[in-house]
């Protein structure tokens, strides 16, 4: 890998997991998949950390919010 100006390695661009796996859809009822994109404190992971594309990040955010409203996911942890 090439080094940047400060001598640190450049990070490899993450590939969107939903684009790579064409058959997977984002569903608010699939709690196990949604938990991967939520921190232990209950916050939704940003795109630059999760590696999702913009389209799937928007769908993922909507699905997480729906799951929270239906009480499948907690809003926060105790």
From Swiss-Prot:
Gene Ontology cellular-component annotations: cytosolic small ribosomal subunit
GO MF annotation, one: small ribosomal subunit rRNA binding
Biological process according to GO: translation
Keywords tagged on the record: Ribonucleoprotein, Ribosomal protein, RNA-binding, rRNA-binding
Pfam families to which the protein is assigned, alphabetical: Ribosomal_S18
Keyword Ribonucleoprotein on entry: yes
PROSITE patterns documented for this protein: RIBOSOMAL_S18 (PS00057)
NCBIfam families cross-referenced by the UniProt entry: S18
Record note on quaternary structure: Part of the 30S ribosomal subunit. Forms a tight heterodimer with protein bS6.
Family: Belongs to the bacterial ribosomal protein bS18 family.
Job of this protein: Binds as a heterodimer with protein bS6 to the central domain of the 16S rRNA, where it helps stabilize the platform of the 30S subunit.
Protein's recorded name: Small ribosomal subunit protein bS18
Species annotation: Clostridium novyi (strain NT)
């Amino acid at each position: 890998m090439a080094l940047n100006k400060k001598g640190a390695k450049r990070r490899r661009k993450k590939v969107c997991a939903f684009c790579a796996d064409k058959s997977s859809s984002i569903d608010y009822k699939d709690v196990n998949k949604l938990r991967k994109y939520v921190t232990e404190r209950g916050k939704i992971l940003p795109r630059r950390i999760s590696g999702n594309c913009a389209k799937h990040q928007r769908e993922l955010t909507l699905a997480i919010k729906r799951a929270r409203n239906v009480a499948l996911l907690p809003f926060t942890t105790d």
